Amino acid sequence: MRHYEIVFIVHPDQSEQVPAMIERYKSTITSHGGQIHRVEDWGRRQLAYMIEKLAKAHYVCMNIECDQTTLDELEHAFKFNDAVLRHLIVKMKKAETGPSPMMKEVQREEAKKAAAAQPAEAQA
């Protein structure tokens, strides 16, 4: 089996369905004997360019290990799911299990928001 990194972008109106989509894709992978090494929900982020007149979308990153038939099935699911605006599948040399650079940035932003919220609560 080979290692892959998958990033897909979901329509912002469908953001509440992202956890169900992730579970569906995870069950597809595991039911065919694959493994999931990392799943990161990057949340709603600014797009680099407009896609279908949208400026923001919901990003999800998955690092998996699977065979070609499972990968074909996932790609088919991405293509025929109207909520998925774009997807990218990249073959990796080894499994990535640590947080991605994008996730580190998301964690930094959340830490800043939490730090800003604490002094505001202390003053109230």
From Swiss-Prot:
KW S-adenosyl-L-methionine (keyword) present: no
InterPro entries for the chain: Ribosomal_bS6 (IPR000529), Ribosomal_bS6_sf (IPR035980), Ribosomal_S6_plastid/chlpt (IPR020814), Transl_elong_EF1B/ribsomal_bS6 (IPR014717)
Superkingdom field: Bacteria
Keywords (A to Z) from UniProt: Ribonucleoprotein, Ribosomal protein, RNA-binding, rRNA-binding
A single MF term (Gene Ontology): structural constituent of ribosome
Region Disordered, residue ranges: 96-124
Entry keyword annotation includes Protein transport: no
Pfam families listed in its UniProt record: Ribosomal_S6
Biased composition (Low complexity): 114-124
Annotated GO CC locations: cytosolic small ribosomal subunit
Biological process annotations from GO: translation
Function field: Binds together with bS18 to 16S ribosomal RNA.
Family, per entry: Belongs to the bacterial ribosomal protein bS6 family.
Protein name: Small ribosomal subunit protein bS6
Species whose genome carries this gene: Burkholderia orbicola (strain MC0-3)
